[in-house]
Swiss-Prot record:
GO terms for molecular function: adenylate kinase activity; ATP binding. This is Adenylate kinase. It is found in: Cytoplasm. ATP binds at residues 10-15, 123, 132-133, 203. Pathway: Purine metabolism; AMP biosynthesis via salvage pathway; AMP from ADP: step 1/1. Monomer. Belongs to the adenylate kinase family. GO terms for biological process: AMP salvage. Consists of three domains, a large central CORE domain and two small peripheral domains, NMPbind and LID, which undergo movements during catalysis. The LID domain closes over the site of phosphoryl transfer upon ATP binding. Assembling and dissambling the active center during each catalytic cycle provides an effective means to prevent ATP hydrolysis.
Length: 218
């Protein structure tokens, strides 16, 4: 089971990724984890990555693809893998195709922008414990206060509406074209292209999970 998980920030990919990885016994691979691991190992590629990151530069697609090929050759990828947040752009997807990285499925978790804004901008956190509330879906007993300690809840900078909308616009600009890319490839070349599935990311976690299973297992 070799798959890519696509979806906007706040679409609930993390919850589904965890379920898929447990179900099929595959690792979840993100570029951030790969880059950190390469730096830690101090391999030739890792030293290159460290140098680029220390100078504040962007790691090139060539290096990322080389890291991907190294990573998926590891023993824990024997049953497959799940790419989360990679590829991010069409050039990265093209580079994966050219590098002959085989994929079985591309799964898009689709959620309307306004629903995502409501989900994320409504989150409130208790800094001391990490307890998470939501002003609509899971409100504290007393507005703005943690149920256990009575201390003030905060809204993380990442969850502010302007920040959420900015992240969504970056997603639509850079990553959403991948949805079209994989959908068209699956239509044009069903023999070699990964199967493309779109799952509605609204409703209960269980209902979404069922859609995911139906898509991946048929």
């Amino acid at each position: 089971m070799r798959l890519i998980l696509l979806g906007a920030p706040g679409a609930g990919k993390g919850t589904q990724a965890q379920f898929i990885c447990e179900r099929f016994d595959i690792p979840q691979i993100s570029t951030g984890d790969m880059l950190r691991a390469a730096v830690k190992e101090g391999s030739e590629l890792g030293l290159k990555v460290k140098e680029i990151m220390n100078s504040g530069g962007l790691v090139s697609d060539d290096i990322i693809i080389a890291l991907v090929k190294e990573r998926i050759a590891q023993p824990d990828c024997a049953n497959g893998f799940l790419f989360d947040g990679f590829p991010r752009t069409i050039p990265q997807a093209d580079a994966m195709k050219e590098a002959n990285v085989k994929l079985d499925h591309v799964l898009e978790v689709a959620v309307d922008d306004e629903e995502i804004v409501t989900r994320l901008a409504g989150r409130r956190v208790h800094p001391g414990s990490g307890r998470v509330y939501h002003v609509d879906y899971n409100p504290p007993k007393e507005e703005g206060k943690d149920d256990v300690t009575g201390e003030a809840l905060i809204q993380r900078d990442d969850d502010r509406e302007a920040t959420v909308r900015n992240r969504l616009s970056v997603y639509h600009e850079q990553t959403e074209p991948l949805v079209q890319y994989y959908r068209e490839w699956a239509q044009q070349d069903p023999q070699t292209a990964p199967a493309y599935h779109r799952v509605e990311g609204t409703g209960s976690v269980e209902a979404i999970r069922q859609q995911v299973l139906t898509a991946l297992e048929g």
